[in-house]
């Protein structure tokens, strides 16, 4: 059970640190409260991201996200405009990082629109077919989008050490 958590945490850690260069104090939004998304909340918070927000459709998963460190949770079904709701709570300019774990066209475009100029979007999930995304907005705002497929040995080792030190992730 813990080994599965380490591999999943390693994926998120790799996306935030190795590829994303997360700096303490930067804002992170996680879209999709599945295993990668929930551990993304815990890892981002433990790395010093602030605030950390979680977006999803299931209140039970959003509650778990709060316990793992989410400062704000948003239920897409309860928000008229999720991008505006996030910007209102976090920053009118947008967020520094989005970890996209839902894999839907809507989630991808919401991620693009809520990301601050110069911000980063980490794709941890992907749609099962081609989708249209707002490339002009990304280019105009210098938004960097990258994907993660796996965690890599070094990130898994770092995640294991990190999780031993930050035992709250495992509780």
Roles of regions detected by a PLM:
Residues 2-79, 84:
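Mid-domain Rossmann-like dinucleotide-binding core that forms the NAD(H)/NADP(H) cofactor-binding site
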Residues 49-50, 119, 141-143:
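A short helix->loop->beta-strand "cap" motif at the edges of active sites that frequently abuts
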Residues 124-125:
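Acidic carboxylate diad motif detector
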Residues 83-88, 92, 128-171:
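C-terminal substrate-binding/catalytic core of Rossmann-like NAD(P)-dependent dehydrogenases/reductases
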Residues 115-117:
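Helix-to-beta-strand junctions that scaffold the AdoMet/dcAdoMet cofactor pocket
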Residues 96-99:
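N-terminal Rossmann-like NAD(P) cofactor-binding module of classical short-chain dehydrogenase/reductase
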Residues 41, 62, 108-112, 135:
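Generic hydrophobic/aromatic pocket-lining and core-packing "Φ" positions
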Residues 26, 119-120:
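Glycine-centered, small-residue-biased loops immediately flanking beta-strands
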């Amino acid at each position: 059970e813990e080994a599965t958590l380490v591999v999943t945490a390693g994926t998120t850690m790799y996306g935030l640190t190795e590829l994303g260069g997360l700096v303490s104090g930067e804002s992170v939004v996680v879209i999709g409260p599945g295993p990668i998304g929930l551990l993304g909340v815990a890892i981002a918070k433990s790395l010093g991201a602030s605030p950390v927000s979680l977006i999803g459709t299931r209140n039970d998963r959003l509650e778990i996200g709060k316990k793992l460190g989410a400062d704000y949770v948003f239920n897409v079904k309860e928000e008229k405009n999720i991008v505006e709701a996030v910007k209102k709570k976090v920053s009118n300019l947008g967020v520094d990082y989005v970890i996209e774990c839902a894999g839907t066209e809507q989630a991808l475009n919401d991620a693009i629109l809520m990301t601050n100029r110069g911000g980063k979007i980490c794709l941890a999930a992907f749609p099962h077919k081609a989708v249209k995304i707002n490339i002009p907005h990304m280019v105009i705002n210098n938004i960097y989008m990258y994907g993660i497929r796996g965690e890599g040995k070094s990130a898994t080792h770092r995640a294991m050490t990190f999780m031993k030190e930050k035992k709250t992730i495992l509780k």
